[in-house]
Amino acid sequence: MSNPLLTFTDLPPFSAIKPEHVKPAVEKAIEDCRARIDAVLVGNAEPSWESVIAPIEEVDDRLSRIWSPVSHMNSVMNSDELRDAYESCLPILSEYSTWVGQHKGLFEAYKAIKASKAFATLSRAQQKTITDGLRDFELSGIGLPAAEQKRYGEISKRMSELGSKFSNNVLDATMGWTKHVTDVNELSGMPESALAAAQAAAEAKGLEGYLLTLDIPSYLPVMTYCDNQALRQELYEAYVTRASDRGPNAGNWDNSEIIAEQLKLRHEISRMLGFNTYSEKSLATKMAESPEQVLGFLNNLAAKAKPQGEREVEELRQFAEQEFGVTALNLWDIAYYSEKQKQHLFDISDEELRPYFPEHKVVSGLFEVLNRVFGMGVKERQGVDTWHESVRFFDIFDSEGTLRGSFYLDLYAREHKRGGAWMDECRVRRINGEGELQTPVAYLTCNFNRPVGNKPALFTHDEVVTLFHETGHGIHHMLTQVEVGSVSGINGVPWDAVELPSQFLENWCWEEEALAFISGHYETGEPLPKAMLEKMLAAKNFQSAMFILRQLEFGLFDFTLHTTYDPEQGPKVLETLADVKKKVAVLPSLEWNRFSHSFSHIFAGGYSAGYYSYLWAEVLSADAFSRFEEEGIFNRETGLSFLNNILEMGGSEEPMELFKRFRGREPQIDALLRHSGIAA
C-alpha cells in the first residue's frame, strides 16, 4: 500500500495520514538522508556548496516535511496510536541527528568549504549556514573520543524521549481531572459565555449541568469570576499540582523523576562538551553572551519592578478588606479580587469587551494591520485538507501580488489538543534541487472558546493579543526572503531574538487607530466605543509589575536551576523555586505548589536555560515599536524597514546587527519600562 507521507509533494495530506504510516516514512526518509551524505562525500576532493551542502539540504528538507505534520498532529489531535507512532520515531531521529553531528567526513567537508576561496563568493545565508554548521558540529561532540561520542548519542536520544513523556504527562493530567457541577448556584458570578461552554462540555459527555476542566478557557473564568471560593480553591489545587506528587491526582502522570533525569543529563552533556553548566551551553547559540549577563539583566529588571509589585499587592489587599471585608488573601483569591479591583478602578471587565471581539472581526482586523504596516494581503484558500473541520487555511501575498507564504489557523480548544498557543513550521522557504522556489507554510495554533449556539466565537482582549503574538512568529517565518532552508524564516534565529516579531506585533492591539477595525460588536458591528477603549487603555498596566515579576520568577527559576545544578546534590527544583520566590515574588507561595511539573517550556519545549528570552526580546520589541510611535503606527516606510531588516532576513545574520540596522542604535530598556508603566 502506498504511504501518503512518502508520496505527497505539496501540502500534507492530513486526512490520509494514519499512525501506521509514520514510522516507515520516517525510516525511509532517514535512510535516504544517510545515503545522500555518504554519496556526496565519496571521492569528493573539492567539497563545495553545490556538491555537498545543497544535495544534503534537499533530503533533509524532505525529512522535515514528513516529520512536521506528524509532530503537529501529535500536538493537536493526540491519540494513543499516534502518540506511540510519534514516540517510536524519536530515538531514530535522535540517532540520525547525532550521526550527522559527529560525522567526521562531513565536518571535514564543511571546514574545507569554509577555508576555500569560493567561500567569499557565497551568499550571506550560505556563509551563515556553514558557520552555524561548524558550531553545531562542536556542540554535537565532533571533537570527543569515541566512547564519549557514544554516550552523547545515548543522552540525546534519552532527552528527546523525556521531553515527550513530560509533555504527555501534562496533557494527560490536564484531561485527567474534571469537575461536574449540577447546581448552577455553585457557579454564581460566572459569565454567560463560560457557563454556556461548561454546559456544552457536559452535554458532549452526556451529562446534565456543567463540566469544568483544567483547560485554560474553562479554568480561567472560574478563577476570575466564580464567587464560590471553595470551588476556586479546588480548581487551583488541581491545576498547580498537575503531573506531580501532590494534589487530587497525586502520583498519576508524575513528572518528578523526569525532571530529575533531564537536569542530570543536561549537566552531563554540557560538562562533556567543555561547559561548566547547562546554562553556558544554552548560551552558545544565543544572543546573550554569558550567564552573568542574563542573571544581571533579570535581577536588574526585578529590582526595578519589585517595589511597584509590592505596592500593587498591598493595594489589592486593602481593596479586598475595605470592599469585601476579606483580611487574608489566598492564591485562589488573587485573580478573583484583582478582577473586582480592576472593575472598581476602571469600570471595565474582559467579559464586557468580549462581544466587541468576534472571531471574524479580529481575524480580518489582524489582516488589515498586516496590510497597512507591511503591504501584505491575506486571502483564505478553500478546499485544503486539514486535521479538523474548524481549521482554516490562508495565503499571504505582497503588494506585487506574489505569494509569500501560507498558514493553517487552528483557533479553538478541544480534547486531545495540547494547551497554550504556538506557531510551528510546516515547511520552510528555500530554492529546491530543481531550482524552484518552495514557499513557506506555518501552523498558527491557539486554544480559544469555540462558537456556542448561534453566537460567533467571542475573544477576550488577551486572546486577541495572543493571536497577534503567534501571527508575529508566523510572519517572521512566512515573509522571509532567504532561500537557504537552514537560516530561512525562524531557522537559525537565536532563541532569545525569536520572540521579537511576536511581541512586536502585539502592540497594535493597544492602539486606538487599529482597534477601530480589529473590534466590532458581533450584533451591531459597532467598533469598541471610545469610553470603553479609554478604560481598557487605562487598565493596560493594571498589575503590570506583578505580571513582569511572575515572568522574572519563571526566567530566574529556569536559569538558576540550570546554572547551580550539582550532580553530587541532585536536582534542587523546589528549593530553587523557593529561593527565587523569596527574591522576586510578591505573592505568598504554597509548599505544595508544583508549578515546575507542568512547566513545559523548559522541560518539553526548547526554552531550557532560555525562558529569559521572552523578557530579553521584550526589550527589543518595545524599543522597535517605539520607532513606530515616533513615526506613525501605520507608517509604511517604517513598516517596510522592519520587514526588510528583520522579518525578511530570517537567521541569515546576527540579530543585534539587524536590530541596529532597523533602529539605528543598540536596544535600550526604557521603552519596555514605559510600556509596562514601571518607573525607570
Language-model-detected regions and their locations in the chain:
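His/Asp/Glu-rich acidic catalytic environments and adjacent acidic regulatory segments
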Residues: 1-28, 33, 75, 82-289, ...
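Short histidine-centered catalytic/ligand-binding loop motif
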Residues: 191, 224, 231, 351-358, ...
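Membrane-entry segments of alpha-helical transmembrane domains in multi-pass membrane proteins
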Residues: 14-26, 48-53, 251-255, 294-301, ...
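C-terminal non-catalytic alpha-helical accessory regions
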Residues: 30-121, 551-561, 565-582, 589, ...
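Short pre-active-site segment immediately N-terminal to the catalytic Zn-binding motif
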Residues: 449-468
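Active-site-proximal, well-structured secondary-structure segments within enzyme catalytic domains
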Residues: 125, 129-131, 158-161, 168, ...
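Short small-residue beta-strand/loop micro-motif enriched in glycine and branched aliphatics
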Residues: 221-222, 290-291, 451-456, 485
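C-terminal, non-catalytic "cap/extension" segments appended to globular domains
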Residues: 1-21, 28, 197, 209-211, ...
